[in-house]
Amino acid sequence: MPAGARYDAAMTDLSAFWRINPSDADPAETREWLDAFDALVQAEGRERATFLLRKLLDHARARRVPLPPVLNTPYKNSIALADQAPFPGNLELEQRISSIVRWNALAMVVRANRAYPELGGHIASYASAADLFEVGFNHFFRSDDLVYFQPHSAPGVYARAFLEGRLSEEQLSNYRRETEGKGLCSYCHPYLMPEFWQFPTGSMGLGPLSAIYQARFMRYLEHRGIQKTAGRKLWAFVGDGEMDEPESLAGLSLAARDGLDNLIFVVNCNLQRLDGPVRGNGSIVQELEGLFAGAGWNVIKLLWGSDWDPLFARDEDGVLLKRLHETVDGEFQTYAATDGRFNREHFFNKYPELRQIIAHMSDADIDRLHRGGHDPVKIYAAYRAAVEHAGQPTVILAKTKKGYGMGLWGQGKMGTHQQKKLDDAALKEFRDRFALPLSDEDVVQLRFFHPGADSQEIRYLEARRKELGGYLPARIVSSSRLAVPSLQVPPRNQSTTMVFVQLLAQLMKDEKLGARVVPIVADEARTFGMQTLFRQFGIYSALGQLYEPEDHEELLYYREAKDGQILEEGITEAGALSSWLAAATSYSSHGTPMLPFYIYYSIFGFQRVGDLIWAAADSRARGFLVGGTAGRTTLAGEGLQHQDGSSHLAASAVPNCRAYDPCFGYELAAIVHDGARRMLEGQEDVFYYVTVGNENYPHPAMPEDAAEGILRGLYRLRDGSQVQLLGSGAILREVIAAAELLEKDWGIQAAVWSVTSFTELRRDGMRAERARRFGAEGEAWVQRCLHGTQGPVVAASDYVSAVADLIRPYVPGKYVALGTDGFGRSDTRAALRAFFEVDARNIAVAALAALQSPLLPEALRRYGIDPGTRPPWER
């Protein structure tokens, strides 16, 4: 709809509304002003009218006149009837298809819960969204578009795929029964259905945020010349209650700044969340309109069906619009749950003028009045306006009824979200409501209905999808493989962070792979020494660089570019992780494998955005998460909030995340190379979490025969016959120093082992243990490495002791795990390591204690360790 037409419609509606507004002290004068303004528009045009309005606003501000908010429009459809795009489809056939899908979705959930009440499931959400989906499937969702589906509506998507022949009746019968490989997962899970679902949206709020950054990544691919994405759309179906999640709104301004007109949000405004109304005492539609419009989005209200058009046409005094404005959502929910007689009495009969507007209508006529989200004609018009709008992202606020069509058993009811069972009477009423050709026995037995491959419905459905390019959702994995170059790190005194930046630069400079590398930071590039990449590779900006940067005369100046390679996201870990997720799934979303590296303060990863990382695992993401300034004692002065001691424990719980904590540059190089090779050449559905620190120290050359152990998680650095010392990350150097203390001060020979991954060692041990449990042979890598060694084993890391404890079941003999349990502190590294009892002296004392050495008391005195102090986790 043209902006001018929307403006005219809005002004006409507001004019009528203000004429009867009781707060208007002089309606006649108001009418004169409005008539004068109409005459101005008629005589001199909209541009002149806009100019004068701006002048008036400026003048009002100068005179300190309070101004009302101007972000809201009247509570009716944004698209006037005269501007409505004609519906091109066969409405009768599409409604029959929709009714069949509705039945099969309902039958799927109810059947599952009759057999196994603990399975759960949802009926009401899809009941409210069915027409929104169907118009998209029949007319708008192209096969190369991306669609983020509202997760609770998954049964409806399954039911449609059943009609399309892509899912079997057996699969529908096994809804939420997956372990035997014949069922369907609860929500949208690519990990569980890797050929079907593309995007996991089950955790509320992550879908909207991920969708925005995915749409932006599509532009990134286009602007960098990697892939043509122009013409493709991204649709995100979200719930109005879901918009209360902070993540749902977090990316709105980014989408507007970048002009993402490839992005369309459809907010299913059924006015209900799980327990009750979303805004019982207000209006979620008006609230969301203000938020989206204020952020710079194009807003389309889809509130009322075609049967409301004659009522608005009869509303000469604006009384209908007034009544709609004053009705809060709690009342609208009640109207949804009740019949036409109730609606006449409590809504329409409030004003005599309004009563007259519907005087010709029966109670049944009133009961049949549709909300906009249930009218395919109005939905089509809104979608058409959205796809044709340029320069802005669009949000469609579609008003619906939760549990639509479920009658007294569910429509608009407070508990409808939890409704999983319907009795026979309710099922028969549902059948009759949607004119389904089912016998009473079919209904009672909850039989799925398919009209037949040669039926009009199926032929029509197939023709529509053929015209749009194919079926959705469908996850298609690229088969292209990218070669990974060798990586070299010269021995020198530096931090593992600087080693990482060198490795990243080598990959980015590679002739074949370089363009596919996506460096991502959340406003900490300088902290990690990545400013060296600014000038050469550029920072991505959809606008390029419209200013001359302050440091433009410097060699490494801050360079933004439309084809920039670095994604500098600002202070938003959730946004940066969403960009990483888009890049890490590009191989399946766009058929273009990419290699993203997101580096961040390690404490602000799994602890801050762990839910997004879990979604990445579900998405089968491929890429590197790099936890910088890692370790509770290695990041010295920052203190309690910033010092990470737990991320590796969290990472160990993510099945397809391979987590490493290297100490030396050659370890990091081996891990990055092997990870890139596995993901790009081997096409393994894994991602890597690697921690790097900011402590400078010498990095030796790689020992012979260390490669396998580095990747498997454990290898020996130094021989010793009396005690085995294991260390990971920065604390490995304390372990080496402890071995030297033991030899120098106490004459004890200690072997030193580098643990690059306690997580990989644990998983290897679990596999071996499981094999033995089932009667096969199995030996853990830890057991293989330590076989034949002497003495107890002492392990230390810069993380909580539970990390080192991960391998306890597989360590032969006595095992002591040291870690940084407790809250962090601001101090020097030496002081912090002494405080957390992971410095060389404490490790040496732990070894003596494990050996039950009589030298222990003397060692405590010599090293100044007071055994009477409270443990660090209690201080």
Residue ranges and their predicted role:
Residues 1, 6-8:
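Short, positively charged and aromatic/hydrophobic N-terminal segments
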Residues 12-168, 494-510, 521:
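N-terminal amphipathic, basic-rich helices that act as targeting or association modules
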Residues 14, 177-200, 206, 220-231, ...:
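Thiamine diphosphate
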Residues 19, 36-39, 86-94, 112-121, ...:
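Glycine- and acidic
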Residues 87-105, 126, 133, 145-146, ...:
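Non-catalytic terminal/interface segments that mediate subunit docking, oligomerization
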Residues 144-145, 219-228, 585-605, 624, ...:
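Glycine-rich phosphate/pyrophosphate-binding loops
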Residues 236-237, 243, 611-632, 637:
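A structural-propensity feature for long, helix-poor, extended segments
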